[in-house]
């Protein structure tokens, strides 16, 4: 008999969530009594605080009143907040009649066994029916359980970007410490900052500029145009051959005396005799038969 009464109350009992904190049971009853006779109207309060939890239960005398209330009041405003109205059903666990009358053993049908919104963690409504609008929507976008991770949600601050930036800076500091330790172990040879700044990865470092660069007049073509090493060798060989020719000319001038540089000093280059020319006739130009 008691179970049959509970089943009858269950069919005519509705769950009202998203209630404003200042809505009273009398206001709630006067709002829903147009859809049928109400036998019970309760707003749930906290056991420890005694404050309203934002939801309540209404029991009609028949099922039709409950259905009409759900049809016309679900998603409407009450006390400047949008409310949700659904069928109420007892939680699994076999509560007695007194617990059902207190409302502690009921939840909205089709919504699971929890009576809190996972968005704002407020009781009395579900995520899809969350009445938070305007600033409240921004404030309760993240569950309250994550507030300790994010920071000041009430101040509309999102510190994920700051945390990522700080994490990136910490990685850079760790890398700097690693490279400094490696440089210390290797005797200062591997300074990654110096290596990347200089642009030459394998060339040795000189203490003075003249040790690295020759005077402008002695620079080779390969230095200006980045020629390979074998071109540099050809340049050196050419300079050696030029040096050998100059030394041969000096030896020849010393050997023949008057054919040395002193005799040709001040004369144009074309008028100077070649290394195999006979001495020119006095006052004349050497002829072709004088060469051998």
UniProtKB/Swiss-Prot annotation:
Pfam families: RRM_1, zf-CCHC. GO terms for cellular component: nuclear speck; nucleus. A zinc finger (CCHC-type) spans 117-132. Expressed in roots, rosette and cauline leaves, stems, floral buds and flowers. InterPro entries: Nucleotide-bd_a/b_plait_sf, RBD_domain_sf, RRM_dom, Znf_CCHC, Znf_CCHC_sf. Keywords: DNA-binding, Metal-binding, Nucleus, Phosphoprotein, RNA-binding, Stress response, Zinc, Zinc-finger. Disruption phenotype: No visible phenotype under normal growth conditions. GO terms for biological process: negative regulation of DNA-templated transcription; positive regulation of mRNA splicing, via spliceosome; response to cold; response to water deprivation. Induction: By cold stress. Down-regulated by dehydration. GO terms for molecular function: DNA binding; mRNA binding; nucleic acid binding; zinc ion binding. SUPFAM superfamilies: Retrovirus zinc finger-like domains, RNA-binding domain, RBD. It is found in: Nucleus. Residues 180-210, 220-268 have a biased composition (Basic and acidic residues). Residues 12-90 form the RRM domain. The modification Phosphoserine is found at residue 20. Its main location: nucleus. Residues 93-114, 180-292 are annotated as: Disordered. Binds RNA and DNA sequences non-specifically. May be involved in tolerance to cold stress. This is Glycine-rich RNA-binding protein RZ1B.
């Amino acid at each position: 008999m008691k179970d049959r009464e509970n089943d009858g109350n269950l069919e005519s009992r509705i769950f009202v969530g998203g209630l404003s904190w200042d809505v009273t049971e009398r206001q709630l009853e006067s709002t829903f009594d147009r859809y049928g006779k109400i036998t019970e109207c309760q707003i749930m309060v906290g056991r420890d605080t005694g404050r309203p939890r934002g939801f309540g239960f209404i029991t009609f005398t028949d099922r039709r009143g409950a259905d009409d209330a759900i049809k016309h009041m679900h998603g409407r405003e009450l006390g400047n907040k949008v409310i949700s109205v659904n069928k109420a059903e007892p939680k699994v666990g076999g509560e007695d009649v007194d617990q059902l009358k207190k409302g502690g053993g009921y939840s909205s049908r089709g919504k699971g066994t929890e009576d809190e919104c996972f968005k704002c963690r407020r009781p009395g409504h579900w995520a899809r029916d969350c009445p938070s609008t305007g600033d409240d929507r921004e404030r309760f976008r993240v569950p309250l359980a994550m507030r300790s991770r994010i920071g000041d949600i009430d101040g509309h601050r999102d510190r994920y970007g700051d945390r990522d930036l700080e994490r990136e800076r910490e990685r850079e500091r760790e890398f700097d410490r690693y490279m400094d330790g490696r440089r210390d172990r290797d005797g200062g040879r591997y300074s990654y900052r110096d290596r990347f700044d200089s642009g030459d990865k394998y060339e040795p470092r000189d203490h003075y500029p003249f040790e690295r660069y020759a005077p402008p007049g002695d620079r080779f073509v390969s230095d200006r145009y980045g020629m390979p090493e074998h071109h540099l060798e050809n340049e050196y060989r050419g300079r050696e051959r030029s040096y050998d020719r100059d030394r041969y000319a000096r030896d020849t001038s010393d050997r023949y005396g008057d054919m040395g540089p002193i005799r040709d000093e001040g004369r144009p280059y074309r008028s100077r005799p070649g290394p195999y020319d006979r001495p020119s006739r006095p006052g004349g130009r050497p002829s072709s038969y004088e060469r051998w």
